[in-house]
Amino acid sequence: MAIKNNVMIVRQRLLTKLVSLWNEGQLVEKIDRVPIEFSPRNSQVRGRCCIHKERAVWKYKSLPLLGYDMTDEADELTPLSDYAKGALDRKKIKDNIMCVIDEACSSCVRTNYDITNLCRGCVARACEHACPKGAIEFDPETSQGKINHKICISCGKCFAACPYHAIVYIPVPCEEACPVGAISKDEYGVEHIDESKCIYCGKCMNACPFGAIFEISQLLAGIRLFLYSVP
């Protein structure tokens, strides 16, 4: 069964728009207006800081649908129309199939564990003794614990030790979904796909709640091939 959520609706809407523009022979002429058309002035922004960020995300989500990934961007000022021209003239497709849209990636959490307000500030402090890095700290007034995320290595020993289950595991959806461990964060907290490990199963794409992982589409090339091959 196909996954149905807002991320997939957005992906389908954008893909439909680009194909419609191509079918009308206006892809190059009108593609630069797509981010503004999809996020007009005073529109409500969902999950982003501002409308300008949302428009940037629309732009970068268009790139893989045109057959590019983020490494193809040499100049941030290059308009979508230039990429559209290149897509229409492309003779060779890219080797990789999946890519991460860094502008859309929310970076999720750096460490997978956190202490909730269920912490009773107990005397035993089993979490503190279980931590191999000394990442558990305590509020001097409430005695409630907190995790120093700069030190935490996400080993989960505190999670297992807490008798109140006050420590929660926070997953990173794309990393959790990947069956071969091909996704990890860089020094800026943005996810990257290790092409030497990736098996292109697409589970990370379906799992990301921000729609930051895209398949590099060859749809336009496929349509052209089909049209030219039909007698």
Task: Give residue spans per PLM region.
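Ferredoxin-type iron-sulfur electron-transfer modules and their immediate structural context
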Residues: M1-A161, H165-A177, G181
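Iron-sulfur-cluster electron-transfer modules
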Residues: H165, I170-P171, E175-E176, V180-P231
